[in-house]
A protein has these predicted regions:
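Active-site mouth of glycoside hydrolases
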Residues: 1-221, 229-254, 260-315
Length: 315
């Protein structure tokens, strides 16, 4: 935290905790919610301590509570607990099988009920280091419904929007001190429907809008020729930001670009791999952020995904 603070970073977007049993490849562990409504107190202790240390440094957290993707449990884990059968992990069963499975979430009342219980438990938790309820913790800037929540299908859009509204209302009913956000990618996370993104953010209990941008995942770059395609990725990024800025202006709500990223030059994770093109892309994004900041418009800030730190935990 001291390192990030020294760089001028004052806002961190953080997963509250993973869901489900440990030992599943590609899923974060150790989990916080090991069974529905059953928690690993050691992990909660870590979140308590993290928030207390943020507060000492005048830093703030956006805490997201759910996840469309399997790497923390999220949708698929709640569906499993709700009796929808084994989860077809995408790295084994393929993307189509996984996406068809999680498409059930939008209309699963039992899964929604389990998640509502989780929201209630977390928002009302008392931090053992500060003695404050999370609902009264100044280190929390925003509760976020999930990481990239999606409807996963045209037929699910209405149910998805109703679920978002229900979650936002639930949080506000327990906590009037903090902002509420959705965690949406933007149009890319709304079945390509920009009007759906606008409508879910227009809800009175949602305080600001969010977008994510992933040029590699969305096919905006050629991994075999990043230098030759990075220009188009930057152009697409500008267009994507602008279209959402216009929509946010219509509903008079701030916009935060809370995720963006690009692979290293040879699409490897090793620390000695160069980052020339990624540096170019990040500079372009930050230039856009600075431009909008100077104009004092609806585009209010950004995070990037992600920071892993220097520590290597024993587990």
């Amino acid at each position: 935290l001291d390192y990030l603070k020294a760089l001028g970073i004052n806002n961190l977007r953080v997963l509250v905790g993973a869901d489900g049993k440990d030992g599943i490849p590609t899923k974060a562990e150790p989990a916080l919610q090991v069974e529905a409504g059953v928690y690993n107190d050691t992990i909660f202790d870590g979140l308590d301590f993290f928030l207390s240390e943020l507060d000492k440094r005048d830093m703030y957290a956006v805490l997201f509570l759910n996840n469309s993707w399997e790497w923390s449990g999220g949708y698929s884990q709640y569906l499993y607990w709700a009796g929808h059968g084994e989860v077809p992990m995408p790295n084994v069963a393929g993307w189509d099988a996984f996406s068809n499975y999680v498409a059930q979430y939008a209309k699963s009342e039992k899964a929604h009920h389990l998640f509502r219980d989780h929201i209630t438990y977390v928002v009302n938790r008392v931090n053992r280091y500060t003695g404050k309820k999370y609902s009264e913790d100044p280190a929390i800037m925003s509760w976020q419904i999930g990481n990239e929540p999606r409807p996963f299908g045209e037929d699910n859009k209405k149910s998805f929007a109703a679920w978002i509204a229900d979650c936002a209302a639930l949080i506000k009913s327990m906590d009037s001190n903090h902002l509420v956000s959705i965690g949406s990618e933007g149009m890319a996370g709304c079945e390509g429907d920009l009007s759906l993104w606008t409508s879910i953010h227009a809800d009175a209990n949602v305080d600001y809008t969010t977008i994510h941008i992933w040029p590699n995942n969305w096919g905006w770059i050629d991994k075999k020729d990043i230098p030759g395609t990075i220009g188009q990725a930057i152009e697409n990024t500008c267009f994507y930001i602008d279209m959402h800025v216009q929509e946010a202006f219509k509903i008079n709500k701030p916009l935060v670009l809370e995720e963006f990223g690009l692979p290293r030059d040879s699409v490897k994770f090793t620390s000695n791999t160069s980052t020339v093109q990624r540096d170019r892309y990040y500079r372009a994004v930050f230039d856009i952020v600075e431009k909008h900041a100077a104009e004092k418009g609806v585009f209010q800030g950004c995070n990037f995904w992600a920071w892993g730190g220097f520590a290597e935990p024993q587990h």
